[in-house]
């Protein structure tokens, strides 16, 4: 995301493609008790915007690269969310995350980072959540036996062209990592049929 023109093209497409799944996410996860959301690698804020629309007392912090944050402010301003969304313009893998968060979202993040970082970020999310807080992981996922679905596999392959050391994450593998860290109430839902899944869980109160 260091090239401004490429970042703009990618972010515009990603924003449009995330608004629909954002509505689905609102139906699947109850954030009515949460007051703070950390959107890690949240791009231009499409998911945050949808979650804040559905939860009036929620405010969001998005961590993403500075040029992505600059593009995101356009969408956040159009959604009239400038007083409820803030950016930490930085690399989510290296910057410090705010603690005591009511919810943490990582959407399309794991498919675009080195696979060795995934377990560490799961542990860091647990650390940064308040007791009872929700973790939401949305991404391209193939079945545990890797037999499909074809579109999810193709999208994962496309991402690996840009991040060769990314990991092809499966729901079962991810559920095991969450359980090892200490998450409870681990659930799996389909977000975009045949393409993406949502794994969500809760930190014990």
Spans of model-derived segments:
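Alpha-helical subdomain
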Residues: 36, 40-205
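Conserved Class I S-adenosyl-L-methionine-dependent methyltransferase catalytic core
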Residues: 1-35
């Amino acid at each position: 995301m260091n090239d401004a023109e490429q970042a703009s093209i990618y972010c515009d497409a990603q924003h449009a493609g995330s608004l629909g799944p954002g509505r689905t996410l609102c139906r699947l996860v109850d954030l009515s008790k949460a007051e703070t959301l950390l959107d890690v690698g949240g791009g231009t804020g499409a998911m945050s915007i949808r979650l804040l629309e559905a939860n009036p007392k929620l405010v969001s912090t998005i961590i993403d690269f500075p040029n992505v944050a600059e593009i995101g402010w356009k969408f956040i301003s159009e959604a009239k969310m400038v007083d409820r969304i803030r950016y930490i313009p930085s690399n989510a893998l290296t910057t410090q995350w705010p603690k005591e968060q009511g919810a943490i979202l990582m959407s399309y993040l794991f498919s675009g980072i080195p696979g060795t970082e995934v377990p560490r970020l799961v542990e860091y999310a647990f650390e940064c959540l308040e007791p009872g807080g929700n973790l939401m992981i949305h991404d391209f996922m193939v079945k545990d036996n890797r037999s499909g679905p074809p579109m999810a596999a193709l999208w994962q392959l496309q991402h690996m062209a840009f991040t060769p050391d990314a990991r092809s994450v499966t729901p079962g593998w991810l559920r095991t990592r969450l359980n090892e860290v200490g998450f409870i109430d681990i659930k799996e839902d389909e977000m975009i049929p045949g393409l993406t899944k949502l794994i969500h869980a809760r930190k014990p109160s």
